[in-house]
Swiss-Prot record:
Keywords: Amino-acid biosynthesis, Cytoplasm, One-carbon metabolism, Pyridoxal phosphate, Transferase. It catalyses: (6R)-5,10-methylene-5,6,7,8-tetrahydrofolate + glycine + H2O = (6S)-5,6,7,8-tetrahydrofolate + L-serine. NCBIfam families: PRK00011.1. Its EC number is 2.1.2.1. It comes from Vibrio cholerae serotype O1 (strain ATCC 39315 / El Tor Inaba N16961). The modification N6-(pyridoxal phosphate)lysine is found at residue 229. Belongs to the SHMT family. Pathway: One-carbon metabolism; tetrahydrofolate interconversion; Amino-acid biosynthesis; glycine biosynthesis; glycine from L-serine: step 1/1. This is Serine hydroxymethyltransferase 1.
Length: 416
Protein backbone atom coordinates (compact mmCIF):
# COMPACT_ATOMS: atom_id res chain seq x y z
CA UNK A 1 0.00 0.00 0.00
CA UNK A 2 1.24 3.46 -0.90
CA UNK A 3 1.06 6.14 1.77
CA UNK A 4 0.09 9.67 0.73
CA UNK A 5 2.61 11.22 3.11
CA UNK A 6 5.55 9.71 1.21
CA UNK A 7 7.91 12.48 0.14
CA UNK A 8 11.14 12.99 -1.77
CA UNK A 9 12.90 14.88 1.04
CA UNK A 10 12.90 11.88 3.39
CA UNK A 11 13.58 9.21 0.77
CA UNK A 12 15.97 10.83 -1.71
CA UNK A 13 17.81 13.77 -0.11
CA UNK A 14 20.25 14.12 -3.02
CA UNK A 15 17.46 14.65 -5.54
CA UNK A 16 15.51 16.82 -3.10
CA UNK A 17 18.54 19.07 -2.67
CA UNK A 18 18.82 19.53 -6.45
CA UNK A 19 15.11 20.41 -6.68
CA UNK A 20 15.44 22.92 -3.84
CA UNK A 21 18.51 24.48 -5.44
CA UNK A 22 16.65 24.91 -8.73
CA UNK A 23 13.67 26.39 -6.89
CA UNK A 24 15.97 28.93 -5.23
CA UNK A 25 17.68 29.68 -8.55
CA UNK A 26 14.34 30.49 -10.16
CA UNK A 27 13.45 32.84 -7.30
CA UNK A 28 16.84 34.60 -7.15
CA UNK A 29 17.63 34.88 -10.87
CA UNK A 30 15.97 37.07 -13.47
CA UNK A 31 14.80 34.79 -16.29
CA UNK A 32 15.13 36.31 -19.76
CA UNK A 33 15.29 33.18 -21.90
CA UNK A 34 12.45 33.80 -24.37
CA UNK A 35 11.20 30.22 -24.33
CA UNK A 36 10.92 29.99 -20.53
CA UNK A 37 8.09 30.94 -18.23
CA UNK A 38 6.58 30.14 -14.85
CA UNK A 39 3.52 27.91 -14.84
CA UNK A 40 0.77 28.18 -12.25
CA UNK A 41 0.41 25.97 -9.16
CA UNK A 42 -2.86 24.71 -10.69
CA UNK A 43 -0.98 23.38 -13.71
CA UNK A 44 1.59 21.72 -11.45
CA UNK A 45 -1.22 20.23 -9.35
CA UNK A 46 -2.65 18.54 -12.46
CA UNK A 47 0.79 17.25 -13.43
CA UNK A 48 1.21 15.72 -9.98
CA UNK A 49 -2.21 14.03 -10.02
CA UNK A 50 -3.10 10.33 -10.23
CA UNK A 51 -3.76 10.75 -13.95
CA UNK A 52 -0.06 9.98 -14.30
CA UNK A 53 -0.95 6.32 -13.61
CA UNK A 54 -3.32 5.86 -16.56
CA UNK A 55 -2.37 4.41 -19.93
CA UNK A 56 -4.75 5.62 -22.65
CA UNK A 57 -3.52 4.73 -26.14
CA UNK A 58 -5.89 6.07 -28.76
CA UNK A 59 -8.31 8.99 -28.58
CA UNK A 60 -11.36 9.81 -26.42
CA UNK A 61 -14.04 7.18 -27.04
CA UNK A 62 -11.61 5.09 -29.12
CA UNK A 63 -9.06 3.73 -26.65
CA UNK A 64 -7.12 0.49 -26.77
CA UNK A 65 -7.40 0.07 -22.98
CA UNK A 66 -10.33 -0.03 -20.58
CA UNK A 67 -10.89 2.31 -17.67
CA UNK A 68 -10.45 5.46 -19.73
CA UNK A 69 -13.86 7.06 -19.17
CA UNK A 70 -12.52 9.73 -16.81
CA UNK A 71 -9.29 10.55 -18.62
CA UNK A 72 -11.49 10.86 -21.72
CA UNK A 73 -13.26 13.71 -19.93
CA UNK A 74 -9.96 15.42 -19.18
CA UNK A 75 -8.73 15.12 -22.78
CA UNK A 76 -12.08 16.29 -24.17
CA UNK A 77 -11.86 19.40 -21.97
CA UNK A 78 -8.36 20.12 -23.25
CA UNK A 79 -9.44 19.69 -26.89
CA UNK A 80 -12.56 21.84 -26.53
CA UNK A 81 -10.68 24.61 -24.74
CA UNK A 82 -7.84 24.62 -27.29
CA UNK A 83 -10.36 24.94 -30.12
CA UNK A 84 -12.18 27.76 -28.32
CA UNK A 85 -8.97 29.57 -27.42
CA UNK A 86 -7.52 29.57 -30.93
CA UNK A 87 -10.68 29.49 -33.05
CA UNK A 88 -10.32 26.14 -34.77
CA UNK A 89 -12.31 22.98 -35.46
CA UNK A 90 -9.57 20.48 -34.63
CA UNK A 91 -7.01 20.13 -31.87
CA UNK A 92 -4.70 17.27 -30.96
CA UNK A 93 -3.45 17.72 -27.39
CA UNK A 94 -1.36 14.54 -27.25
CA UNK A 95 2.08 15.59 -28.62
CA UNK A 96 4.68 15.35 -25.86
CA UNK A 97 6.54 18.40 -27.19
CA UNK A 98 6.52 21.03 -29.89
CA UNK A 99 9.16 19.12 -31.83
CA UNK A 100 7.01 15.97 -31.76
CA UNK A 101 4.01 17.98 -32.91
CA UNK A 102 6.11 19.25 -35.81
CA UNK A 103 7.35 15.75 -36.58
CA UNK A 104 3.74 14.55 -36.78
CA UNK A 105 2.91 17.27 -39.31
CA UNK A 106 5.83 16.22 -41.52
CA UNK A 107 4.73 12.59 -41.26
CA UNK A 108 1.11 13.43 -42.05
CA UNK A 109 1.71 15.65 -45.08
CA UNK A 110 5.04 14.68 -46.66
CA UNK A 111 7.10 11.79 -47.91
CA UNK A 112 10.86 11.56 -47.27
CA UNK A 113 12.71 13.62 -49.86
CA UNK A 114 9.87 16.10 -50.44
CA UNK A 115 10.87 19.75 -50.75
CA UNK A 116 10.17 22.10 -47.86
CA UNK A 117 10.68 25.86 -47.53
CA UNK A 118 11.67 26.85 -43.99
CA UNK A 119 13.22 29.79 -42.18
CA UNK A 120 16.98 29.46 -41.78
CA UNK A 121 18.06 28.74 -38.21
CA UNK A 122 20.72 31.44 -38.59
CA UNK A 123 17.99 33.98 -39.44
CA UNK A 124 15.63 33.06 -36.59
CA UNK A 125 14.06 29.73 -37.54
CA UNK A 126 13.96 26.55 -35.45
CA UNK A 127 15.81 23.22 -35.59
CA UNK A 128 12.65 21.47 -36.79
CA UNK A 129 12.20 23.88 -39.69
CA UNK A 130 14.92 22.18 -41.71
CA UNK A 131 18.20 22.36 -39.82
CA UNK A 132 20.64 19.78 -41.23
CA UNK A 133 21.29 18.35 -37.75
CA UNK A 134 17.56 17.70 -37.19
CA UNK A 135 15.24 15.02 -38.63
CA UNK A 136 13.62 17.75 -40.74
CA UNK A 137 16.89 18.51 -42.50
CA UNK A 138 17.99 14.89 -42.76
CA UNK A 139 14.81 13.42 -44.31
CA UNK A 140 13.54 16.29 -46.46
CA UNK A 141 14.93 18.57 -49.15
CA UNK A 142 14.97 21.89 -47.31
CA UNK A 143 15.25 25.27 -49.03
CA UNK A 144 15.94 28.01 -46.45
CA UNK A 145 14.58 31.55 -46.57
CA UNK A 146 15.67 34.43 -44.37
CA UNK A 147 15.40 38.08 -43.43
CA UNK A 148 16.45 41.15 -45.42
CA UNK A 149 18.86 43.94 -44.47
CA UNK A 150 16.14 45.65 -42.44
CA UNK A 151 15.63 42.50 -40.38
CA UNK A 152 12.24 41.67 -41.90
CA UNK A 153 11.21 38.36 -43.47
CA UNK A 154 11.94 38.67 -47.18
CA UNK A 155 8.60 37.64 -48.70
CA UNK A 156 9.75 38.41 -52.24
CA UNK A 157 12.67 36.02 -51.78
CA UNK A 158 10.30 33.45 -50.27
CA UNK A 159 7.99 33.71 -53.27
CA UNK A 160 10.87 33.46 -55.75
CA UNK A 161 12.23 30.38 -53.97
CA UNK A 162 8.77 28.81 -53.90
CA UNK A 163 8.25 29.39 -57.62
CA UNK A 164 11.70 27.97 -58.37
CA UNK A 165 11.67 24.90 -56.11
CA UNK A 166 7.92 24.09 -55.91
CA UNK A 167 7.92 22.96 -52.27
CA UNK A 168 5.21 20.66 -50.99
CA UNK A 169 5.16 22.58 -47.70
CA UNK A 170 6.10 26.08 -46.55
CA UNK A 171 6.88 26.56 -42.86
CA UNK A 172 6.13 29.79 -41.01
CA UNK A 173 7.17 30.52 -37.45
CA UNK A 174 10.39 31.21 -35.62
CA UNK A 175 12.48 30.96 -32.47
CA UNK A 176 14.26 34.31 -32.74
CA UNK A 177 12.29 36.82 -34.85
CA UNK A 178 10.86 39.96 -33.28
CA UNK A 179 8.51 41.29 -35.96
CA UNK A 180 4.92 40.69 -37.10
CA UNK A 181 4.62 37.84 -39.60
CA UNK A 182 2.35 38.31 -42.61
CA UNK A 183 0.55 34.96 -42.48
CA UNK A 184 -1.81 36.00 -45.29
CA UNK A 185 1.11 36.66 -47.65
CA UNK A 186 2.61 33.31 -46.75
CA UNK A 187 -0.65 31.54 -47.59
CA UNK A 188 -0.84 33.37 -50.92
CA UNK A 189 2.69 32.18 -51.75
CA UNK A 190 1.81 28.62 -50.72
CA UNK A 191 -1.33 28.69 -52.87
CA UNK A 192 0.65 29.85 -55.92
CA UNK A 193 2.67 26.64 -55.87
CA UNK A 194 0.06 24.29 -54.39
CA UNK A 195 1.95 23.89 -51.11
CA UNK A 196 0.70 23.32 -47.60
CA UNK A 197 1.24 26.23 -45.22
CA UNK A 198 2.36 24.90 -41.85
CA UNK A 199 2.91 27.43 -39.04
CA UNK A 200 4.81 26.74 -35.84
CA UNK A 201 3.56 29.48 -33.51
CA UNK A 202 5.24 28.08 -30.38
CA UNK A 203 6.91 31.33 -29.36
CA UNK A 204 3.88 33.58 -29.73
CA UNK A 205 0.97 31.27 -28.87
CA UNK A 206 0.19 33.14 -25.66
CA UNK A 207 0.26 36.49 -27.43
CA UNK A 208 -2.03 35.07 -30.13
CA UNK A 209 -4.45 33.61 -27.58
CA UNK A 210 -4.67 37.06 -26.00
CA UNK A 211 -5.17 38.84 -29.32
CA UNK A 212 -1.99 40.92 -29.13
CA UNK A 213 -0.29 39.18 -32.09
CA UNK A 214 -1.93 38.10 -35.38
CA UNK A 215 -3.17 34.52 -35.51
CA UNK A 216 -2.02 32.17 -38.29
CA UNK A 217 -5.00 29.85 -37.70
CA UNK A 218 -7.25 31.46 -40.37
CA UNK A 219 -4.50 31.12 -43.00
CA UNK A 220 -2.49 27.95 -42.31
CA UNK A 221 -3.48 24.40 -43.20
CA UNK A 222 -1.91 23.26 -39.92
CA UNK A 223 -0.62 25.11 -36.86
CA UNK A 224 1.51 23.71 -34.04
CA UNK A 225 2.66 25.15 -30.75
CA UNK A 226 4.23 24.27 -27.48
CA UNK A 227 2.02 24.71 -24.43
CA UNK A 228 4.69 26.36 -22.28
CA UNK A 229 6.62 29.50 -23.41
CA UNK A 230 4.22 32.47 -23.66
CA UNK A 231 1.22 30.16 -23.13
CA UNK A 232 2.60 29.45 -19.63
CA UNK A 233 1.26 25.90 -19.38
CA UNK A 234 3.00 22.55 -18.94
CA UNK A 235 5.82 21.46 -21.23
CA UNK A 236 4.10 19.84 -24.19
CA UNK A 237 2.84 20.20 -27.76
CA UNK A 238 -0.42 20.97 -29.58
CA UNK A 239 -1.65 20.69 -33.18
CA UNK A 240 -4.50 22.83 -34.57
CA UNK A 241 -6.29 22.90 -37.92
CA UNK A 242 -9.39 24.05 -39.79
CA UNK A 243 -8.57 22.10 -42.96
CA UNK A 244 -11.25 19.40 -42.84
CA UNK A 245 -11.79 15.80 -41.77
CA UNK A 246 -9.28 14.25 -44.15
CA UNK A 247 -6.52 16.45 -42.69
CA UNK A 248 -7.62 15.71 -39.11
CA UNK A 249 -7.44 11.95 -39.70
CA UNK A 250 -3.93 12.25 -41.15
CA UNK A 251 -2.76 14.32 -38.20
CA UNK A 252 -4.30 12.00 -35.61
CA UNK A 253 -2.70 8.95 -37.23
CA UNK A 254 0.68 10.69 -37.41
CA UNK A 255 0.60 11.40 -33.67
CA UNK A 256 -0.75 7.98 -32.68
CA UNK A 257 0.30 5.41 -33.71
CA UNK A 258 2.72 7.16 -36.07
CA UNK A 259 5.02 8.88 -33.61
CA UNK A 260 3.85 8.18 -30.07
CA UNK A 261 2.26 5.48 -27.96
CA UNK A 262 0.36 6.35 -24.82
CA UNK A 263 -0.35 10.02 -24.17
CA UNK A 264 0.68 11.68 -20.91
CA UNK A 265 -2.73 12.13 -19.33
CA UNK A 266 -1.49 14.17 -16.37
CA UNK A 267 0.13 16.62 -18.81
CA UNK A 268 -3.02 16.75 -20.95
CA UNK A 269 -5.00 17.63 -17.81
CA UNK A 270 -2.45 20.37 -17.10
CA UNK A 271 -2.91 21.65 -20.66
CA UNK A 272 -6.66 21.85 -20.02
CA UNK A 273 -6.01 23.98 -16.93
CA UNK A 274 -3.61 26.25 -18.82
CA UNK A 275 -6.08 26.76 -21.68
CA UNK A 276 -8.76 27.78 -19.17
CA UNK A 277 -6.33 30.21 -17.53
CA UNK A 278 -5.52 31.66 -20.97
CA UNK A 279 -9.17 32.63 -21.43
CA UNK A 280 -9.18 34.81 -18.30
CA UNK A 281 -9.08 38.63 -18.68
CA UNK A 282 -5.91 38.85 -16.57
CA UNK A 283 -4.10 36.59 -19.04
CA UNK A 284 -4.86 39.03 -21.85
CA UNK A 285 -3.58 41.89 -19.69
CA UNK A 286 -0.44 39.89 -18.90
CA UNK A 287 0.35 39.28 -22.58
CA UNK A 288 -0.08 42.98 -23.40
CA UNK A 289 2.42 43.79 -20.63
CA UNK A 290 4.86 41.20 -22.03
CA UNK A 291 5.08 43.16 -25.29
CA UNK A 292 5.26 46.54 -23.51
CA UNK A 293 8.14 45.30 -21.36
CA UNK A 294 10.02 44.00 -24.41
CA UNK A 295 9.59 47.35 -26.17
CA UNK A 296 10.76 49.20 -23.03
CA UNK A 297 13.92 47.08 -22.87
CA UNK A 298 14.65 47.59 -26.57
CA UNK A 299 14.37 51.36 -26.19
CA UNK A 300 16.79 51.33 -23.25
CA UNK A 301 19.35 49.12 -25.02
CA UNK A 302 19.24 51.45 -28.03
CA UNK A 303 19.63 54.51 -25.81
CA UNK A 304 22.78 52.89 -24.41
CA UNK A 305 24.18 52.36 -27.91
CA UNK A 306 23.34 48.70 -28.50
CA UNK A 307 22.18 47.37 -31.86
CA UNK A 308 18.88 45.48 -31.93
CA UNK A 309 18.24 43.06 -34.81
CA UNK A 310 15.27 44.37 -36.85
CA UNK A 311 15.66 47.64 -34.89
CA UNK A 312 12.54 46.94 -32.80
CA UNK A 313 10.26 44.28 -31.37
CA UNK A 314 6.57 43.57 -31.88
CA UNK A 315 6.40 40.52 -29.62
CA UNK A 316 8.03 39.08 -26.49
CA UNK A 317 11.62 38.81 -27.68
CA UNK A 318 14.51 40.62 -29.31
CA UNK A 319 18.11 39.96 -30.31
CA UNK A 320 20.98 42.16 -29.17
CA UNK A 321 23.72 42.25 -31.83
CA UNK A 322 27.11 42.52 -30.09
CA UNK A 323 29.37 42.47 -33.16
CA UNK A 324 30.12 46.21 -32.93
CA UNK A 325 30.88 45.85 -29.21
CA UNK A 326 33.42 43.09 -29.89
CA UNK A 327 31.73 40.89 -27.30
CA UNK A 328 30.74 37.31 -28.03
CA UNK A 329 27.33 35.96 -27.11
CA UNK A 330 29.08 33.34 -25.00
CA UNK A 331 30.91 36.03 -23.00
CA UNK A 332 27.74 38.08 -22.55
CA UNK A 333 25.78 35.02 -21.43
CA UNK A 334 28.43 34.16 -18.83
CA UNK A 335 28.85 37.70 -17.46
CA UNK A 336 25.10 38.28 -17.15
CA UNK A 337 24.71 34.85 -15.60
CA UNK A 338 27.26 35.80 -12.93
CA UNK A 339 24.96 38.74 -12.11
CA UNK A 340 21.98 36.33 -11.78
CA UNK A 341 20.51 37.41 -15.13
CA UNK A 342 19.79 34.41 -17.36
CA UNK A 343 19.83 34.89 -21.14
CA UNK A 344 20.98 32.69 -24.00
CA UNK A 345 23.69 33.32 -26.54
CA UNK A 346 22.21 33.51 -30.03
CA UNK A 347 23.47 33.84 -33.58
CA UNK A 348 22.63 37.08 -35.36
CA UNK A 349 22.12 37.47 -39.13
CA UNK A 350 25.41 37.03 -41.01
CA UNK A 351 27.12 36.03 -37.78
CA UNK A 352 30.87 35.47 -38.31
CA UNK A 353 31.12 33.31 -35.18
CA UNK A 354 30.09 29.69 -34.65
CA UNK A 355 26.73 28.73 -33.07
CA UNK A 356 28.69 27.67 -29.98
CA UNK A 357 30.10 31.18 -29.52
CA UNK A 358 27.77 33.57 -31.43
CA UNK A 359 27.71 37.36 -31.61
CA UNK A 360 24.42 38.05 -29.89
CA UNK A 361 22.04 37.32 -27.06
CA UNK A 362 18.32 36.60 -27.18
CA UNK A 363 16.18 38.35 -24.58
CA UNK A 364 12.54 37.55 -23.75
CA UNK A 365 10.08 39.10 -21.30
CA UNK A 366 7.40 36.42 -20.55
CA UNK A 367 8.96 35.28 -17.27
CA UNK A 368 9.83 38.70 -15.81
CA UNK A 369 6.34 39.96 -16.66
CA UNK A 370 4.81 36.88 -15.03
CA UNK A 371 6.53 37.78 -11.75
CA UNK A 372 5.27 41.36 -11.92
CA UNK A 373 7.90 43.49 -13.66
CA UNK A 374 6.55 46.86 -14.82
CA UNK A 375 7.85 48.84 -17.80
CA UNK A 376 10.05 50.85 -15.41
CA UNK A 377 11.43 47.63 -13.92
CA UNK A 378 12.15 46.40 -17.46
CA UNK A 379 13.99 49.64 -18.29
CA UNK A 380 16.03 49.40 -15.09
CA UNK A 381 16.90 45.80 -15.93
CA UNK A 382 18.06 46.74 -19.43
CA UNK A 383 20.28 49.42 -17.89
CA UNK A 384 21.80 46.92 -15.46
CA UNK A 385 22.50 44.57 -18.36
CA UNK A 386 24.21 47.36 -20.29
CA UNK A 387 26.31 48.15 -17.21
CA UNK A 388 27.54 44.55 -17.18
CA UNK A 389 28.13 44.41 -20.94
CA UNK A 390 29.97 47.76 -20.89
CA UNK A 391 32.22 46.42 -18.12
CA UNK A 392 32.24 42.75 -18.96
CA UNK A 393 35.44 41.93 -17.04
CA UNK A 394 34.71 44.14 -14.02
CA UNK A 395 33.74 41.88 -11.13
CA UNK A 396 32.73 44.89 -9.04
CA UNK A 397 30.08 45.94 -11.57
CA UNK A 398 28.87 42.35 -11.91
CA UNK A 399 28.56 41.94 -8.13
CA UNK A 400 26.79 45.30 -7.71
CA UNK A 401 24.33 44.28 -10.44
CA UNK A 402 23.76 40.93 -8.76
CA UNK A 403 22.75 42.71 -5.55
CA UNK A 404 20.19 44.80 -7.49
CA UNK A 405 18.85 41.61 -9.04
CA UNK A 406 18.51 39.90 -5.66
CA UNK A 407 16.64 42.93 -4.30
CA UNK A 408 14.07 43.06 -7.11
CA UNK A 409 13.64 39.27 -7.00
CA UNK A 410 12.87 39.52 -3.29
CA UNK A 411 10.37 42.31 -3.99
CA UNK A 412 8.74 40.36 -6.85
CA UNK A 413 8.78 36.63 -5.98
CA UNK A 414 7.72 34.09 -8.61
CA UNK A 415 5.47 32.24 -6.18
CA UNK A 416 4.28 34.45 -3.31
Amino acid sequence: MLKRDMNIADYDPELYAAIQEETLRQEEHIELIASENYTSPRVMQAQGSQLTNKYAEGYPGKRYYGGCEYVDKAEALAIDRACQLFGCEYANVQPHSGSQANSAVYMALLNPGDTVLGMSLAHGGHLTHGSPVNFSGKHYNVIPYGIDEAGQINYDEMEALALEHKPKMIIGGFSAYSQIVDWKRMREIADKVGAYLFVDMAHVAGLIAAGVYPSPVPFAHVVTTTTHKTLAGPRGGLILSNAGEEMYKKLNSAVFPGGQGGPLMHVIAAKAVAFKEAMEPEFKEYQARVVKNAKAMVAQFQERGYKIVSNSTENHLFLVDLIDKNITGKEADAALGAANITVNKNSVPNDPRSPFVTSGIRVGTPAITRRGFTEQDAKDLANWMCDVLDNINDQGVIEATKQKVLAICQRLPVYA
